[in-house]
Amino acid sequence: MRTIISLLLLSAMVFAEIEAISLEEGLQLFEGERGCVGENQQCANWAGPHCCSGYYCTCRYFPKCICRKDSGK
């Protein structure tokens, strides 16, 4: 009986740790996207603001860098 209770407690602790790690990774991903800009917005890859997922920063004329949609090429 003690063995069963010990295994249940151990399983609960492992599950809680896995959930905490998943939540932490999700928050880090969200924080990384928080300061991003969308299509045709000014960007600066080296210092920010950075383009959101699915966009890339292109600089045709130096200070005028803008985010363009990533076509996957």
From Swiss-Prot:
SUPFAM superfamilies: omega toxin-like (SSF57059). The keyword Cell inner membrane does not apply. Disulfide bonds join 36-52, 43-57, 51-67, 59-65. PROSITE patterns: MU_AGATOXIN. Residues 1-20 form the signal peptide. Residues 21-34 form a propeptide. It holds the Pfam family Toxin_7. The keyword Secreted applies. InterPro entries: Beta/delta-agatoxin_fam. GO terms for molecular function: sodium channel regulator activity; toxin activity. Expressed by the venom gland. The presence of a 'disulfide through disulfide knot' structurally defines this protein as a knottin. Insecticidal neurotoxin that induces an irreversible spastic paralysis when injected into insects. Modifies presynaptic voltage-gated sodium channels (Nav), causing them to open at the normal resting potential of the nerve. This leads to spontaneous release of neurotransmitter and repetitive action potentials in motor neurons. This is U3-agatoxin-Ao1i. It comes from Agelena orientalis (Funnel-web spider).
